[in-house]
């Protein structure tokens, strides 16, 4: 009995090996799990559920098949795919969760989230995030013709890469106070997130207990998952 967590696959047509690795993971690992949680950035970008890109239909079919075989799949939006909506969720059989969610697994209460909200030192990004998560701005963007949305998304990705290249590693990592506040706010001693692409298990000292923050790795040259069982919480890398 196990529950699996993944994040930061950044699936795109430009990286077919990662897509193949994900599909293999679904067939080899996820099919045997109690549930699969995807903690954001499943896709490199997402400009709306009406995008006819065949890759998205392929991924949706694989996830739907998983659900039909009795393995539920849950999704928390990332900073790349925050516009993924109900239409794709229904097509893929995924359940959309709030940006911070507590799950109880095998006697543990675990806070799960993408992780970008913990990076509070990156004030430029947090201001940008607040704007693009405005429901009115999202609605206006989705009204724009698909071709123009594609161009806007490409421009924003390039701008983001340029901005990040000039930022320090410290600014782009989580803020310690934000982490502790999240633990205390949700009254948990376990946390799993992605976003930073810095896989590790960290101990965090809270007033009454030592908590654990598990960071998923990105799927660049290998896969990364967290496997939670009754006995253990493991951070695992594996070849595609």
Swiss-Prot record:
Catalyzed reaction equations: UDP-2-N,3-O-bis[(3R)-3-hydroxytetradecanoyl]-alpha-D-glucosamine + H2O = 2-N,3-O-bis[(3R)-3-hydroxytetradecanoyl]-alpha-D-glucosaminyl 1-phosphate + UMP + 2 H(+)
Subcellular location, record wording: Cell inner membrane
Cofactor: Mn(2+)
Residues binding Mn(2+) 1, per UniProt: 8, 10, 41, 197
Record-listed substrate binding positions: 79-80, 122, 160, 164, 167, 195
Keyword Lipid biosynthesis: yes
Gene Ontology annotations of biological process type: lipid A biosynthetic process
Enzyme nomenclature, EC number: 3.6.1.54
InterPro entries hit by this protein: Calcineurin-like_PHP_ApaH, LpxH-like, Metallo-depent_PP-like, UDP-diacylglucosamine_Hdrlase
Annotated residues for binding of Mn(2+) 2: 41, 79, 114, 195
One GO MF term: UDP-2,3-diacylglucosamine hydrolase activity
Transmembrane segments: none
GO CC annotations on file: cytoplasm; extrinsic component of plasma membrane
Main location: membrane
Cofactor remark: Binds 2 Mn(2+) ions per subunit in a binuclear metal center.
Function of the molecule: Hydrolyzes the pyrophosphate bond of UDP-2,3-diacylglucosamine to yield 2,3-diacylglucosamine 1-phosphate (lipid X) and UMP by catalyzing the attack of water at the alpha-P atom. Involved in the biosynthesis of lipid A, a phosphorylated glycolipid that anchors the lipopolysaccharide to the outer membrane of the cell.
Protein name: UDP-2,3-diacylglucosamine hydrolase
